[in-house]
Amino acid sequence: MKFAVIVLPGSNCDIDMYHAVKDELGHEVEYVWHEETSLDGFDGVLIPGGFSYGDYLRCGAIARFANIMPAVKQAAAEGKPVLGVCNGFQILQELGLLPGAMRRNKDLKFICRPVELIVQNDETLFTASYEKGESITIPVAHGEGNFYCDDETLATLKENNQIAFTYGSNINGSVSDIAGVVNEKGNVLGMMPHPERAVDELLGSADGLKLFQSIVKNWRETHVTTA
């Protein structure tokens, strides 16, 4: 399986994402600069965290107009896995690939520490290696991770089982403790915590590795045939 790591001006987690796939997962991965226009040949798309374009206007607002974004939307439409982490999640919201919006954290402070997440849905291609209700530890690093949506959207997310992860303890004011959601098809995931920073016990947790393993497992089941 071959992954693309989208690199935007201000990305700062692209190296971590590359390391998770290449060194820990053992799969192909390439950096794709924001000025590119094609993602042909890639099986999965990863949009890392950071402060794309300085987070001017609002987080992800300018990144949505990058040359590469139509190709990201096309990959999602084709059913390829698309993962957006932190700023990547905000970008997916700006693209209209995921619902909701991000507000400033409730205490108006930047939060950077490991947090407990609860797996709410183990039936997506991103979470199949977890168990529903499983408690995992993944670090966060954000100032605007307060997930917000209206009551109607929240009801739809719950009805469609689109809430992938919630916080064990609500750290930022997110509606219903939401830390990550998928689209209706289940092939696009946005999450504020950083799984790519939790792929080795030396870093304090390897719980994030299961997410990447889930992606590969699903891809193998749907693309690899045995004689």
Curated annotation (Swiss-Prot):
Instruction: Give the UniProt record's GO annotations in the biological process aspect.
Output: 'de novo' IMP biosynthetic process
Name a GO molecular-function annotation: ATP binding
Active-site residues are C86 (nucleophile), H194, E196
- Entry EC number(s): 6.3.5.3, 3.5.1.2
- Specify the pathway: Purine metabolism; IMP biosynthesis via de novo pathway; 5-amino-1-(5-phospho-D-ribosyl)imidazole from N(2)-formyl-N(1)-(5-phospho-D-ribosyl)glycinamide: step 1/2
> Would the keyword Magnesium be found if you checked this record's keyword annotation?
no
Q: Which residues form the Glutamine amidotransferase type-1 domain?
A: 3-225
Q: Name one Pfam family in it.
A: GATase_5
Task: Extract the CDD domains matched here.
Answer: GATase1_FGAR_AT (cd01740)
**One GO CC term, this protein:** cytoplasm
What does the UniProt entry say about where the protein is found? Cytoplasm
Q: Which UniProt keywords apply?
A: ATP-binding, Cytoplasm, Glutamine amidotransferase, Hydrolase, Ligase, Nucleotide-binding, Purine biosynthesis
The family database entries (InterPro entries) matched by this protein are listed as: Class_I_gatase-like, PRibForGlyAmidine_synth_PurQ
Question: What reactions does this protein catalyze?
Answer: N(2)-formyl-N(1)-(5-phospho-beta-D-ribosyl)glycinamide + L-glutamine + ATP + H2O = 2-formamido-N(1)-(5-O-phospho-beta-D-ribosyl)acetamidine + L-glutamate + ADP + phosphate + H(+); L-glutamine + H2O = L-glutamate + NH4(+)
Assembly with partners or alone: Part of the FGAM synthase complex composed of 1 PurL, 1 PurQ and 2 PurS subunits.
Q: Which NCBIfam families match?
A: FGAM_synth_I, PRK03619.1
Primary role:
Part of the phosphoribosylformylglycinamidine synthase complex involved in the purines biosynthetic pathway. Catalyzes the ATP-dependent conversion of formylglycinamide ribonucleotide (FGAR) and glutamine to yield formylglycinamidine ribonucleotide (FGAM) and glutamate. The FGAM synthase complex is composed of three subunits. PurQ produces an ammonia molecule by converting glutamine to glutamate. PurL transfers the ammonia molecule to FGAR to form FGAM in an ATP-dependent manner.
**Per its record, how is this protein called by name?**
Phosphoribosylformylglycinamidine synthase subunit PurQ
**Organism listed in the record:** Bacillus subtilis (strain 168)
Q: Which gene encodes it?
A: purQ
